[in-house]
Curated annotation (Swiss-Prot):
Peptidoglycan polymerase that catalyzes glycan chain elongation from lipid-linked precursors. It is found in: Cell inner membrane. It is an enzyme of class 2 (transferase). It is a single-pass membrane protein. InterPro entries: Glyco_trans_51, Lysozyme-like_dom_sf, PBP_transglycosylase, Pep_trsgly. It comes from the Bacteria. The chain crosses the membrane at residues 5-25. This is Biosynthetic peptidoglycan transglycosylase. It catalyses: [GlcNAc-(1->4)-Mur2Ac(oyl-L-Ala-gamma-D-Glu-L-Lys-D-Ala-D-Ala)](n)-di-trans,octa-cis-undecaprenyl diphosphate + beta-D-GlcNAc-(1->4)-Mur2Ac(oyl-L-Ala-gamma-D-Glu-L-Lys-D-Ala-D-Ala)-di-trans,octa-cis-undecaprenyl diphosphate = [GlcNAc-(1->4)-Mur2Ac(oyl-L-Ala-gamma-D-Glu-L-Lys-D-Ala-D-Ala)](n+1)-di-trans,octa-cis-undecaprenyl diphosphate + di-trans,octa-cis-undecaprenyl diphosphate + H(+). One of its GO terms (cellular component) is peptidoglycan-based cell wall. One of its GO terms (biological process) is peptidoglycan biosynthetic process. The lineage of its organism: Bacteria, Pseudomonadati, Pseudomonadota, Alphaproteobacteria, Hyphomicrobiales. Pathway: Cell wall biogenesis; peptidoglycan biosynthesis.
Length: 226
């Protein structure tokens, strides 16, 4: 009995430590998300074509950071101010967009599971801070842009999402198209950049303005210009 308990404890500890051991290896390569793996194993449709950060339209990272995590370049994996605002809103009975940073979403997508869970959040916080400490900001953003879900039929990453929405590579997206891509990120199954509704178009306009703002910090190389 004790042996079985010991083996179980070791297995649990090993599973908890595995993401921390794998993270340094993700400085290179083309990592996949747990959701991508699940869809592949379950036989559901799934498409992802990796695109290097340098090949993406310069408007994409700016639009996504402007929409998802404006303090991405200054926090260390967790935006504590945004988190406090979310908790205050929840206490007041207001339901708004979550306060997860891009780094938290990378932690969740790479190693954890979707859905709301206190246990998942407890695992996500230290893992996000570890990812921020181990990987460069540009690499974190590159991974996020390549593993986020971007379409209703298993389109993962900006390349698959761009080809689905606009019929061409993410390399040549305009600022408007990049903003439309950013606007559907909370729910790419119900929102569409291909046939954007009034709400998506309105959000895209807002994100275009934010992406051009001088105060939006950049912590990645932009060799192509914008």
């Amino acid at each position: 009995m004790r042996r079985a308990i010991g083996v179980t404890v070791l297995a649990v500890v090993g599973l908890l430590l595995l993401p921390y051991l794998l993270t340094p290896l993700y400085r290179t390569g083309h990592p996949v998300s747990t959701l991508m793996i699940w869809r592949k194993l379950s036989g559901a449709s799934m498409s992802r074509q990796w695109i290097d950060f340098a090949a993406m339209s310069p408007a994409l990272p700016r639009s996504v950071v402007a929409s998802e995590d404006a303090k991405f370049c200054s926090h260390h994996g967790i935006d504590w101010d945004s988190l406090r605002d979310v908790l205050d809103d929840a206490e007041d009975g207001e339901v708004k967009r979550g306060g997860s940073t891009i780094t938290q979403q990378v932690a969740k997508n790479l190693f954890l599971w979707p859905g709301r869970s206190v246990i998942r959040k407890a695992l996500e916080f230290p893992l996000a801070m570890w990812i921020d400490a181990v990987l460069p900001k540009q690499r974190i953003l590159e991974i996020y842009l390549n593993i986020a879900e971007w379409g209703p039929d298993g389109q993962f990453g900006v390349e698959a999402g761009s080809r689905y929405a606009f019929g061409r590579s993410a390399t040549g997206l305009t600022a408007r198209e990049a903003a439309l891509m950013a606007a559907i990120l909370p729910n790419p199954v119900r929102r569409s950049a291909r046939k954007p509704g009034p709400g998506v178009r309105r959000l895209a306009g807002t994100y275009m303005v934010r992406a051009r703002a001088a105060e939006l910090r950049s912590c990645w190389r932009d060799d192509r210009g914008s």
